[in-house]
Each structure stands twice: as C-alpha cells, then as structure tokens.
C-alpha cells in the first residue's frame, strides 16, 4: 500500500513547478515517480517521417519524483495556499487506513 495513489491530489514541493497542484494520473514504482496532470510539462519535436509526413511539436506530462510531491490535506483557495501533509497509517477494524498527519483524518 503506497502513500500516494492514483487520483490523489498532490502539490509539488520543489523544482520549477513548485506550488502547483494536480491529480496523479499514473504511478511508476520502478522509477519512484508519478505523472501529475498539468505538472512538469515537456515539449518534444518530431521530425517528418514516412508515417508522419508533417513534423509536429508534442507537449506531454513527464514523470516527477515522489520525493518532490506531497499529498494535499486542504485544497487551495484564493486567500490560502494548499496545505501539504505527510501520510501515516492506522489499523481500524483489521483494515489499514491512510491518515493525513496534519489533520488526523482518513484520506
């Protein structure tokens, strides 16, 4: 059971996209990375080929390391930024539940 899962809302802690929020689209456990919607956008220039007669410029979300991400306890508003939190685990009724450390509530 991972601390960050697919469809979780996360905030970027460091790097060019610091402070940006997005939903986790995909996890890559082998690289300890995740693809987050709207974060770490890269562009790729494709040359013309037999299949693709016109060259093109593609934009896509590149993976970002999990160590640079934190789960969002409370979403951002106009007045206040998003509150990042660490994740803990608690066993209730023989089930392992994720807990937000800042709020103490189940995720």
From Swiss-Prot:
GO terms for biological process: translation. GO terms for molecular function: rRNA binding; structural constituent of ribosome. SMART domains: KOW. Pfam families: KOW, ribosomal_L24. Keywords: Ribonucleoprotein, Ribosomal protein, RNA-binding, rRNA-binding. One of its GO terms (cellular component) is ribosome. One of two assembly initiator proteins, it binds directly to the 5'-end of the 23S rRNA, where it nucleates assembly of the 50S subunit. PANTHER family: MITOCHONDRIAL RIBOSOMAL PROTEIN L24. Part of the 50S ribosomal subunit. This is Large ribosomal subunit protein uL24.
